[in-house]
Regions:
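Signature of N6-adenine DNA methyltransferases within the class I
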Residues: 1-134
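Polybasic, glycine- and aromatic-enriched phosphate-binding surface used to engage nucleic acids
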Residues: 96-316, 320-336
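Acidic, carboxylate-rich catalytic segments that either coordinate divalent cations
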Residues: 339
Length: 340
């Protein structure tokens, strides 16, 4: 039997149980990874899944990477033989097998003796307000409502704010100067609410906000939980390498970015220096996954597996191999080199 399947069969959590079942019930399982879109009008990439010999078992998959789909009488003969046991070692993902055997071998060798992000930091999501536009105010709105500045906390609302090496007090001052809605109304339970805040909560915007799922399922509805001031922020969607930006202004962040809390004794400067290495760029590609439109997505569980600053000689064939591997993975997610 044969199916057209989403290309996320190469990385999605559901692909693990599916391919485990296929390997345990078919004598032959082949995946044809098609780099150029099968259906150009769709944002979804598609691959082909072929299985034969129902009732049998197999200890390997055949992954055939092809540039462009064309109609043929039978599946491609050539491909990479992927042992099921080795596929499991790669977190039951097929995407790493788009790389050459040399690149995979180097990745495993370097990663084995290197530190991963989860060894030096905790990575989580930011807070969820349930009504972002209501809980984030512009300075002019706060002034108009009579809400005191000490109740407003500078906030990173999305990845667009992650520019440069750090968010500084100058960054926050720029938000104020440009009257941007980057200030969270940060209220705490048990604190008496000023009259101006009560009026704001009882406004039409407040009445609408409290009907949202998140707001109506917390008490009190206007206290946003899980608000933290991390050491850094990490973009979870990116074109090139995800941005790791230091938090020098005690900002907080929504769940549109990841929050990074360093372990004791760790330095954000050292971490950023390591983050910029080619090997870490490759690790982001290997541990993350395509989102569509050329974007790379890095979930918290994927981010903690990213290898930090794996060392290869920058003048060596190893470094050239890493650079080529990064380029290969980006081509498969249709990332246009030179954009970011």
């Amino acid at each position: 039997m044969a199916f057209v399947v989403p290309a996320e069969i190469g990385h999605a959590p559901y692909a693990g149980p599916l391919l485990e079942y296929m390997s345990g019930h078919f004598a032959f399982v082949q995946i044809a990874a098609v780099r150029r879109k099968l259906f150009p009008e769709l944002s979804e990439d598609c691959w082909l899944l072929y299985a034969d010999g129902f009732g049998g078992k197999t200890q390997h998959f055949l992954l055939s990477a092809i540039e462009r789909f064309s109609f043929k009488d039978k599946p491609p003969d050539a491909g990479t033989r992927v042992p099921v046991a080795e596929w499991r070692m790669w977190h039951r993902r097929l995407r790493p097998f788009l790389l050459s055997a040399d690149a995979r071998g180097l990745y495993q060798e370097v990663a084995r003796d290197s530190v991963r992000l989860g060894d030096v930091a905790r990575v989580g999501i930011g807070y969820v307000t349930g009504a972002n536009d209501f809980f984030h105010l512009r300075p002019s709105e706060a002034e108009q409502q009579g809400i005191s500045g000490d109740l407003l906390h500078p906030a990173v609302r999305n990845g667009k704010a992650l520019r440069g090496r750090a968010i500084t007090w100058a960054t926050v001052a720029s938000w104020r100067r440009h009257d941007q809605p980057n200030f969270l109304l940060r209220l705490t339970d048990g604190r008496e609410l000023p009259a101006a805040v009560r009026r704001y909560l009882d406004s039409q915007g407040g009445r609408d906000a409290r009907t949202s799922y998140k707001c109506r399922n917390r008490t009190p509805w206007y206290v946003v939980p899980d608000v933290t001031e991390p050491d850094a922020f990490l973009s979870y969607m990116s074109g090139g390498t995800p941005c790791l930006v230091a938090n020098q202004a005690s900002c907080v962040a929504t769940n549109s970015v990841h929050v990074v809390k360093l372990a004791e004794g760790q330095s954000i400067t050292r971490l950023q220096r390591a983050w910029d290495t080619p090997f870490t760029q490759l690790s982001c590609e290997v541990e993350g996954h395509p989102l569509g439109g050329g974007l790379l997505k890095l979930e918290p569980g994927e981010a903690v597996r990213v290898v930090i600053g794996g060392k290869t000689d920058q003048r060596s064939a190893e470094d050239r191999l890493v650079q080529h591997a990064v380029s290969t993975m980006r081509q498969w997610r249709h990332y246009a080199e030179g954009s970011r």
